[in-house]
């Protein structure tokens, strides 16, 4: 039985080593390579733009041909940009509250860009018909507008009339965050029946994304028939298309680590939806779209349908709010909380709750760690006692092993009888470790995928809890004027984590098995290198958790 425990602990350590080793030695170098490629690509694109002098002053990237098209300016607390009156396309959107990086002059994050720009990314809501004779607004239609500015206080009303006298009306509203509501109305003044279908699409030119194997999802996503559908860019590229016929579509879209663009169709009917890939003129494009059933509008009648577009930051409370307000199933799952969703989201709520009082997510992590420790104190106490008893029983266990070395069945019976007699649970020593594994991964997920943690400072030199510790001992934490390679970026917090881990081991009962004891001695050093590239918020949690464990073990040693 003792061997089983050792094997269990070894398996846990090995699993963690493989997961984090993959992250450190495979994913991180790949990320760096891709980031370099992206930087080179951006530099080349900028050079081309400068040579052609096609930059539009208003948005900084819209080419000159686009600047001739009339636009409706978007202005809210969270967004700026414009909507093209040609084709009524949402293709110019900037997130005002978020910078691309921490540098002083960093530009704001751009989400949508016109179709003929380098990072084309846009959304449309419109109408189609199964009859070619029906004249509907299309991508070349120039809409008439009653206003030049769209804001939360001022909706925009647009209209267009075809040659048969059919009037098309569109009302666009935007809230103070990232949600657009588009209501389309068709008034059939003609003498013919009008078959129409409402559609929505999001189209994106493929750009290299941050690799995060088994860490988070990036790419097409949606809730169809109340099931979450996630497809990577590679999945859709291989399949070319993933179709869903006559389904309940709550939402579909394209997600990045922190940003989401999503279509939210009217709930009045089912929709056909598609996740598509296309290669046109050497350019890779991905598209998600939906289309409604045919609606027949008789002469003299009118028809209205309402759809929504979400385009912005994946804030937890905001997605929760929209999910409840508009009954959008699984909208919060656009944030990839991972396998431990039922733990990860409550952990975030706890951190966010204390952040509301202390104003610092780093301090919030410390408070949540204390609460978790208090909840697990009784279990840790029992675990410590069990480990102590197991060590005291080791000589007797060795005697039984020697006595019944040729009879494994009898050997196990005798060892189990000894455990029962001494009232020892051999698994109890592992329980705190097993319980903390999902908590650890949950905190890691919260730090890695939630926008609330992005560029969030702690104290001192820590300006971003979601990024690695920027210091390193190999240049004396910045005193020496050179930057070591990435694998030598071992900062103050990783070192503190390793030191506290070593001290905790010294205060814990040493494993009875000599080999296991030797392995455990090297774990602080292994974890020092392994976790140096992880979010510093995770290292703050682990270091603080180790310090609390040391205090806890001191208390148990003194009073037991």
Swiss-Prot record:
Keyword Chaperone assigned: yes
Give the matching HAMAP family: YidC_type1
The record lists the membrane-crossing segments as 5-25, 334-354, 357-377, 431-451, 476-496, 522-542
Q: Any idea what this protein is called?
A: Membrane protein insertase YidC
Output the Gene Ontology cellular-component terms.
plasma membrane
Q: Which CDD domains match?
A: 5TM_YidC_Alb3 (cd20070), EcYidC-like_peri (cd19961)
Residues forming coiled coils: none
**Protein function:** Required for the insertion and/or proper folding and/or complex formation of integral membrane proteins into the membrane. Involved in integration of membrane proteins that insert both dependently and independently of the Sec translocase complex, as well as at least some lipoproteins. Aids folding of multispanning membrane proteins.
Keyword Calcium in the entry? The reply is no
Membrane topology per the entry is: Multi-pass membrane protein
Q: What quaternary arrangement does the UniProt entry report?
A: Interacts with the Sec translocase complex via SecD. Specifically interacts with transmembrane segments of nascent integral membrane proteins during membrane integration.
